[in-house]
Amino acid sequence: FYAICEELGIDYPKTWTFDCADPDVAIDAESFTYPLIAKPSNSARYDLMDFPGKEKVYEVQTPDDLLRIFDLLREAGYDRELVVQDFIPGDDDALRSLTTFSDASGEVRVVSGGRVVLQDHSPARIGNPMCILPERVDRIIEDAKRFCKHVGYRGFGNFDIKFDARDGSYKFFEINTRPGRNTYYVAQGGANIARLLVDEYILHREIPYQEAYGDTLYTCVPKKVIERHVSNPELRDEVLDMYRSGHTGYPYDNPRDTFAHKLYARVTFMHQVQKFDRFMGSGKNA
């Protein structure tokens, strides 16, 4: 991914990789500038593992932290690469999510995205967007289009991006090569997700270009979580206005679902208050 970004001139965090399966690999931890972020390169393999100290993404504050994390993954039997990256400063609201749908030629036919208001802060799910405000950014749309066209990408792709206030750039972290839960904001913006798949893969119809940006907030958290844990006052007020006006959408809500599913969805939704208080503190704007 990063080699392609380098080739196309797409901004990305400075990145190093270390093979956990190679016994001869040694990390010169003192040579880095901290803080850093470390994460496994193969999430599919990593998700199947269970061991004490496991986290989805590791914050690395010191050389000792980096060596400890590398040894932890090795000893747990993780046999793929550890990705180490420059830490991009900024709160959750510096993050951007962009979803594309491309045809067989790699041309992006549908694009949607937004500004992350809050992400999950629990160790096992850190980084999963929990609230996204619709926002269109020309620069990241054009970068994503060039990437998809260059590799001939087909279908749904979800790009994780972060605004770097140090130089005004948008750094691309990765592409998730499948639709995820937050792909729901594509539907909120007016594009039918199922129809796109049917038209492209079954009916082989030409899909007209569409930018699916609506005026509905994607959210998996109650209003109280926003009140307590969004520190940016302007952003917080904008998001709360959308709650008050009813311009919100929760991906687990469906009037056709069974009572049991509706109950599960509502309990999961309300549980986020307790969960965010646990991992971010219970004080207002903690």
Task: State each model region's role.
Residues F1-V83, A104-S105:
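Active-site nucleotide/adenylate-binding loops and adjacent lid/helix of ATP-dependent enzymes
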Residues V83, R154-N158, I207-Y213:
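Flexible, glycine/charged-enriched surface loops at secondary-structure junctions
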Residues V117-P129, N176-G190:
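Glycine-rich phosphate/pyrophosphate-binding beta-alpha loops
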Residues C20, V60-S122, E135-K145, F163, ...:
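Phosphate-binding site of ATP-dependent enzymes
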